[in-house]
């Protein structure tokens, strides 16, 4: 499905996307491959910012389920996203792409604080900006952080790279008869509790008219194909079914 007129996008990656074949942590070859995808998209003339989850290192909700204090566990998850952001920054800069990391939890020895106008200037100058540490507060997912940054940066679309090629009516890994949707409305996603992003993230995108594009980031070259309208994806937006 074509995505015309895009100038600025936010790409949301799960932390698990950086694991590659490993069961945990960061696989340098996989990060380098993801960075090449981002560079290819940037070379199309797009302004790009990223949000990366932290589930490959630590997931706050999983920690809370095992008895940890939820807020404490979420802060640990936020720190994991900073580690992933620094890994991606390194990979992008090795490809010659100037990159800045901005963290919602200030740590000025390793990255900038989140400053909206500074982030906008970075992108206008052709730099990639990676937003880390979610929204800087517990009880919010990195999906919510991605929706917030997409709204702040006035992005034309939020692209969510996952391990599947769109949104289905059932888990395609468990149900061979699962059907993929080409387009969905925000309200349909919320009403049917479809697993696109958490409800607060979808609502924030709806209120700011930011389309959500769900696609498979693990397929080489797929980000560029989706941006060209040639790849397989699901678009969540206004006026869809």
UniProtKB/Swiss-Prot annotation:
GO molecular function, one term: UMP kinase activity
Subcellular location: Cytoplasm
Modes of activity regulation: Inhibited by UTP.
Gene3D superfamilies in the record: Acetylglutamate kinase-like
Cellular component aspect of the GO annotation: cytoplasm
Positions contributing to ATP binding: 12-15, 55, 59, 162, 168, 171
Any Pfam family hit: AA_kinase
Pathway membership: Pyrimidine metabolism; CTP biosynthesis via de novo pathway; UDP from UMP (UMPK route): step 1/1
Keyword entries, A-Z: ATP-binding, Cytoplasm, Kinase, Nucleotide-binding, Pyrimidine biosynthesis, Transferase
The EC number(s) this enzyme carries: 2.7.4.22
Family (UniProt): Belongs to the UMP kinase family.
Alphabetized PANTHER family for the sequence: URIDYLATE KINASE, URIDYLATE KINASE PUMPKIN, CHLOROPLASTIC
Subunit-structure text: Homohexamer.
Functional summary from the UniProt entry: Catalyzes the reversible phosphorylation of UMP to UDP.
Name by which UniProt lists this protein: Uridylate kinase
Gene source species: Sphingopyxis alaskensis (strain DSM 13593 / LMG 18877 / RB2256) (Sphingomonas alaskensis)
């Amino acid at each position: 499905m074509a995505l015309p007129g895009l100038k600025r996008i936010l790409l949301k990656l799960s932390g698990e996307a950086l694991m590659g074949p490993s069961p945990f942590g960061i696989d340098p070859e996989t990060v380098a491959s993801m960075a090449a995808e981002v560079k290819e998209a940037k070379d199309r003339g797009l302004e790009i910012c990223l949000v990366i989850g932290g589930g490959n290192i630590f997931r706050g909700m999983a920690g809370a389920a095992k008895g940890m204090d939820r807020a404490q566990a979420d802060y640990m998850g936020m720190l994991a996203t900073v580690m992933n952001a620094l890994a991606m920054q390194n990979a992008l800069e090795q490809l010659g792409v100037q990159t800045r990391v901005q963290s919602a939890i200030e740590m000025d020895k390793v990255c900038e604080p989140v400053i909206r106008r500074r982030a906008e200037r970075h992108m206008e100058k052709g730099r990639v900006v990676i937003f880390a540490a979610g929204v800087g507060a517990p009880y919010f997912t990195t999906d919510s952080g991605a929706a917030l940054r997409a709204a702040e940066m006035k992005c034309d679309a939020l692209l969510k790279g996952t391990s599947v090629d769109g949104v289905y009516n059932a888990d395609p890994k468990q149900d061979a008869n699962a059907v993929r949707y080409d387009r969905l409305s925000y309200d349909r996603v919320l009403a049917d509790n479809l697993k696109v992003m958490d409800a607060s993230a979808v609502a924030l995108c709806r209120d700011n008219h930011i389309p959500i594009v769900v696609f498979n980031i693990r397929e080489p070259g797929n980000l560029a194909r989706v941006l060209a309208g040639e790849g397989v994806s699901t678009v969540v937006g206004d006026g869809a079914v």
